[in-house]
């Protein structure tokens, strides 16, 4: 979602009013960024949110995502070195790659805000054709990572009770109930 149309800003604005501070790293498509930049900058400044927009890359498929992950890792390291991050809130799977690595390497708590079963959604939506061996490998990679995200995160946010129940139905996941909260988009 473009940052201006997502639930992210209202969510963290509420938390800043409770005394928390944020560095928000987002990937923005150039046209949307140019259209909304001044508004989002003003909202962030007014609420003491440090926004770090990065350019979203789409092509070539897969390699562009690897490039975006590298950019995210670099800025996350810079922010941690300068400010000493105390929690990383990862909205979806790509950012969770960074959150999990920071948890493992630096001991920083990691909140996994899953949104949905991303790898399955890519397959169900026809974006990843499992007949293609590369997409089949990427799908398997993220399904394995998904288990690590659930197991190793300090807390998980699911959009639905059905999502939470699905996770808890998997082998060796039935004990995760207390660390999974359901927060629908409409909240």
Regions found by a protein language model. Name each.
Residues 70, 74-78, 97, 101-105, ...:
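Membrane-proximal helix-turn-helix segments that form the acceptor-binding/catalytic region
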Residues 162, 186:
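Carbohydrate-associated surface elements
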